[in-house]
Design a protein with these regions (language model features):
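Short, surface-exposed beta-strand/loop "edge" segments at domain boundaries and coil↔beta transitions
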Residues: 26-30, 50-52, 71-77, 105-111
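Residues that act as N-cap/strand-start positions at coil-to-secondary-structure junctions
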Residues: 29, 36-38, 47-49, 82-86, ...
Length: 121
C-alpha cells in the first residue's frame, strides 16, 4: 500500500518501485515489467528488455522518454525490435500513473499504467 503524506502526494510519482503494464490496443499483445523511479531517472525491465530513461512531473502530469534494449533472446519483444526509444505522457492519479506513448521507430501507440508498489529512499 502506498505511503502518502498529504493531498499533494496523491498527484506525485514518489521515488519507488512500480509495476508497469502496457498494451498497443484491446486486441493487441500486452506486456508487463517493473520500473524504479528515482529523482527523474527511470530504470527497469521485463523478461526480454531492460528500460532506461528519464521522467518529469508537474501539476499531476508526467512525461517520460525511455530507451529499451534487449537482454534476452528467449522471449520475443512486444515491440518487435531489439532497441527502441519511446516517449510517454500521462496523468498521475492517487500515486499511480496512466498515459500513452509512441515511438518514431514503431507504428504503434501504447497505453501504459504504472502502479506504485513500494517507496525507496
Amino acid at each position: 500500500m502506498p505511503i502518502h503524506r498529504g493531498q499533494e502526494a496523491w498527484s506525485l510519482l514518489l521515488n519507488g518501485l512500480y509495476s508497469i503494464e502496457f498494451s498497443a490496443g484491446p486486441d493487441k499483445p500486452r506486456g508487463s515489467g517493473v520500473v524504479v523511479l528515482c529523482d527523474g531517472i527511470l530504470l527497469g525491465g521485463d523478461s526480454s528488455l531492460f528500460y532506461k530513461g528519464t521522467y518529469s512531473q508537474r501539476d499531476g502530469k508526467f512525461e517520460a522518454t525511455v530507451r529499451t534494449s534487449r537482454h534476452s533472446h528467449h522471449t520475443p519483444s512486444l515491440f518487435g525490435l531489439d532497441e527502441a526509444t519511446l516517449s510517454f505522457t500521462g496523468t498521475i492519479i492517487r500515486g499511480d500513473a496512466r498515459g500513452f506513448g509512441a515511438s518514431s521507430q514503431l507504428d504503434i501507440k501504447l497505453e501504459v499504467h504504472l502502479r506504485f508498489r513500494t517507496q525507496i529512499a
